[in-house]
C-alpha cells in the first residue's frame, strides 16, 4: 500500500495546473451511455475513480479509450449489459449515476448499491424516489437496485421531482434520465454546483433541452434521442481549493492555472479574511501568503453547506490551516456524518482540536511535529498532506489510495511547487 513521505517547512512557489473536476467527469462519463453515438471528453483527470468508471462502462460493452493528454473517447453504440456489478463499484459512490442513463435509454438497469468513502450516510432513496416519480419500477434486492419501466411503456415520463434534501448525484441522475423522458420534468430543490452546470451544458451539446441549471429549479423537456458531442470537463474547484489552503498554510506565491475563482467564492472569502492575498487573473487564480501562519494568518470559523456556501469537501483542508493559524475557530459540519475522522490524526501531529457532535473547536498552535498518520477518506487525506507540509520533521501519510481517488498526481504537483514530498510504493514501504 503506497504512502507519502513529507518533509515539512518549505514554502510553495510557482504554477500548478488544475485538473478537470472528478465530480463532473464521473457523471459525464455516464452521460455517454445516453447515446449510441461517439462522445469525446477532454480534461478528464487521471484518478482511481475515473479508472473504475471506465472499467465499469467497458464491462457494459462500451468502447472507451483514454490517452495521456486527458482525452477520453466513448462509444456506447454496442452497449449490451445495462448492469453495474458490485465487484466493479464497491469502492466508488458514483456508480449510482449509471442508473438514470441506463433506465432512460434501455428501459431497465441493475446497479449495485454504491461503496466509496466511509463518511456517513449518503442514502440512495432520493434517487429511487425521483425515478419512481418518472414512472420507474425499482426494487432493492441482494444489494442491487433493479429498475424497469412498466409493461407497455418505452420511455420514462416527465414529472415534478422535489427531493427531501439537496442531492448532487440525485440532481445529476434526474437530469440525465429526464433528457430522454417523455414530456417535461421539473427539478425543485436541485443542486446548484458548477459540476451540475457543466453536466447540463454537455447534455445540451448532445441535444437535450434544459433550462435553469445553476439554480434550484431546473426544467427539462425530454427528447426522443440524443447525439454524440465533444466536451471539456470543468476545472476541479476542490483540487484548486486544496492547493489554495496548502499555499496559505506553508506560505508562498502560486498561480493555479485553469482554476475558476467564481466557483470558489466561499473558500476564497475565508482565505482573504484569514490574511491571504487571492486574486482572479487571466487563465486562473493567484494566491500569496506569508509564513509562519501562526503569526500572519487568523483562524476562521465556518459551517459547511450546499453550494454556493462553504463546501463540505473543503472542510478538512481548511481545518488543517486553522490548526496552525492564530486564534481559535469553530468548524461546523452540516452535510455528512462522520466527517471529522481526520481530527485524531491531526492531533497526532500536535493539533489542538475538540469535537462535540457536528462542531470541531480548533485552537491554533505555533508548530506541528511530523508523525505517521493514516488517511481515512479522500478529503481527510488531503488535509493530512497539508498538515505534513508545515510540520517539523517527517510525516508519513498511510493509505493514500484514498487520495488517488480524487487527486490527479498530487505529490508530483506539490513537488513542482517546491515541496519535499515523495511516494513510497507498497513494496518499498
Curated annotation (Swiss-Prot):
Annotated localization: Cytoplasm
GO cellular component: cytoplasm
Protein residues bound to UDP-N-acetyl-alpha-D-glucosamine: 93, 122-126, 313, 335
Signal sequence bounds: none
Any Pfam family matching the protein: EPSP_synthase
Keyword Lipid metabolism in record: no
Predominant location: cytoplasm
Catalytic reaction list: phosphoenolpyruvate + UDP-N-acetyl-alpha-D-glucosamine = UDP-N-acetyl-3-O-(1-carboxyvinyl)-alpha-D-glucosamine + phosphate
Family: Belongs to the EPSP synthase family. MurA subfamily.
Function: Cell wall formation. Adds enolpyruvyl to UDP-N-acetylglucosamine.
Organism superkingdom: Bacteria
Positions carrying 2-(S-cysteinyl)pyruvic acid O-phosphothioketal: 117
Entry keyword set: Cell cycle, Cell division, Cell shape, Cell wall biogenesis/degradation, Cytoplasm, Peptidoglycan synthesis, Pyruvate, Transferase
Stored HAMAP family: MurA
Binding site for phosphoenolpyruvate: 22-23
Organism of this sequence: Variovorax paradoxus (strain S110)
KW Metal-binding (keyword) present: no
Coiled-coil parts of chain: none
Record pathway: Cell wall biogenesis; peptidoglycan biosynthesis
Name recorded for this polypeptide: UDP-N-acetylglucosamine 1-carboxyvinyltransferase
Molecular function as annotated in GO: UDP-N-acetylglucosamine 1-carboxyvinyltransferase activity
Gene name for this UniProt entry: murA
Gene Ontology BP annotations: cell division; cell wall organization; peptidoglycan biosynthetic process; regulation of cell shape; UDP-N-acetylgalactosamine biosynthetic process
